[in-house]
Amino acid sequence: MDAQHLMTMSGISLEQVAIMGCSLGTGLLVSMIIYNYFFHPLARVPGPCTGAIFPFWSMSSLYRRRLNPDLAELHKKYGQILSLLSGYGGLLMCPRNTGPIVRVGPNQLSFATVEAQKMIYNAKPTHTGSDELFGRDGTLQDVLLSMILGAANIGSLSNRAEHKKMRKRLQPGFTSKALFEQESLLRMHMDRLLQGLAQDTGVIDLTEYFSRFLWDLIGDLSFGEPLVPEKHGRRTDTLRSLVGVYQGCFPILEAINYAVPQIEGVLKLALQLVPPATLRAVLPSATFREYDHPAINSHTTPLQCCINRQDGRSDFLTHIMGDKSSNPTELELSYDELHSNATVLMIAGYKTTETSLSALFYRLLSTPGVLEKLQTELFSNFQSIDEITGKKLLSLPYLNGCVNESLRLTPAVAGKFASRRSPGAIIEGFYVPSGTEVYTETYTMQRSPQYWHAPDEYRPERWFERGEGSPYAQDVHEAFKPFSSGPRACLGREMALQTLRLTAALLVYRFHLKIVNEDRFVWEQDTDSRMIYSKYHIKAIVQERLT
């Protein structure tokens, strides 16, 4: 007896079943909206209505690729009214220029204060047995990162103890001693960049030059040799397959993460069930394994050559592997784990540094008077370009001010993608229930008038003119967190800063630079902003100085 016959016997038609189903679905939807907007534990936190009932606000912002400016505007909007802070003891009303807390999703809060930054990212583990006070477990972005890379790495490990162990293994590659040892490698790639710029004529796209330079440099440091020479024509395609897949899924992930909270567990289980060989064949990161070593045979990858190498060279990967000559058992990571870590260092180091370098030269060339002051500082300290070293550049206040100020205005990674899960804690006077996704919005905090004088203006002198009577005396430098903070802060911070300082110093010392901006490009208006920036270009006329 089929279902239709049963319904006929009971006097219920298919049309009535459909109507009842639609009514039930509508009722559940209305109930969810009413609960999220009026009765949810986060209902008293200010924020857009479209964010309270469903993650429509985040989905829209990510789809339109305007995440950083949209979040800044959101915090500003809710800072113009009396920002509502709720704690155990009742309600506290306080006026601020920038709303300290905004509800951007049904179960998601964005903060923009130093206090929240410390609480979320620097808090020590609790005595309750959880991994950490604010953990990464349960964030769908981390699961997706694991899927893309296919093995445990410094970026995807959510367990605090395991992450600490991995970070300790990688840390020797990023110490001051390691940076000094790696400077010759940096200068080798830098010389190629300078030579290419010197030979080019007309209007030059600096961003494209920076992209090639950093791809070769970071690939050399991560895999033991530059990946994908330009003649292969596959450098851009490779990165797009890795980063594009990740970013393109963001709007959908926002909906899935809310509608199916258990999706992370399902994906983690799937990763365990799928054979590693199958994952390697289908994941975008598999393309890194296809590159041939030019000196050996077509079946030997750069990573394997680096593992086999005995020349004592210092790079990221040799520190990951440890000193095999003195302790053969030190190589505790599998090939897949080595590859996964090298890949994540490659992706993170390349794209973020390229963004920061392009943003730095955009500020240098488009802000009146800045380039001239930097030139004066460099020529007064160095008689020739050969005298310029990373160590000497540390003592130049204006150069370091230029770098820091660019990072303040343009942090490479959006704060949303360093989100954590609350274990149930009070942040900014508001009790944040367990499981709530929280993060500090770096872009907003680093442009907040609460912490900075003239927050939207590029003023390198704010970093060294801080004496009595200075307009920058009250600037709060604790609000400067372009590399995040705490145990998961960017491992390559010092390497990135050294690359930015050296590139700026060498280019400004050797060349006359003049921006060409016929299309009136403005960084804040014309770049795409999601997890990272995209669609930016810095065009300039570059002429070698007469010596």
Swiss-Prot record:
Residues reported in the UniProt entry to bind heme: 490
UniProt xrefs under InterPro entries: Cyt_P450 (IPR001128), Cyt_P450_CS (IPR017972), Cyt_P450_E_grp-I (IPR002401), Cyt_P450_sf (IPR036396), Cytochrome_P450_monoxygenase (IPR050121)
Obligatory cofactor(s): heme
Glycosylation sites: 341, 404
Stored SUPFAM superfamilies: Cytochrome P450
Catalysis performed (reactions): sesterfisherol + 3 reduced [NADPH--hemoprotein reductase] + 3 O2 = sesterfisherate + 3 oxidized [NADPH--hemoprotein reductase] + 4 H2O + 4 H(+)
Keywords: Glycoprotein, Heme, Iron, Membrane, Metal-binding, Monooxygenase, Oxidoreductase, Transmembrane, Transmembrane helix
Pfam families in the record: p450 (PF00067)
Localization (cell): Membrane
GO biological process: one example: small molecule biosynthetic process
EC numbers, comma separated: 1.-.-.-
Entry's transmembrane regions: 19-39
Pathway this chain belongs to: Secondary metabolite biosynthesis; terpenoid biosynthesis
Membrane topology label: Single-pass membrane protein
Function text: Cytochrome P450 monooxygenase; part of the gene cluster that mediates the biosynthesis of sesterfisheric acid. The bifunctional terpene synthase NfSS converts DMAPP and IPP, and also GGPP, into sesterfisherol. The C-terminal prenyltransferase (PT) domain of NfSS catalyzes formation of GFPP, whereas the N-terminal terpene cyclase (TC) domain catalyzes the cyclization of GFPP to sesterfisherol. The cytochrome P450 monooxygenase NfP450 then catalyzes oxidative modifications of sesterfisherol into sesterfisheric acid.
Protein family (similarity comment): Belongs to the cytochrome P450 family.
Protein name per its UniProtKB record: Sesterfisheric acid synthase
Gene name in the database record: NfP450
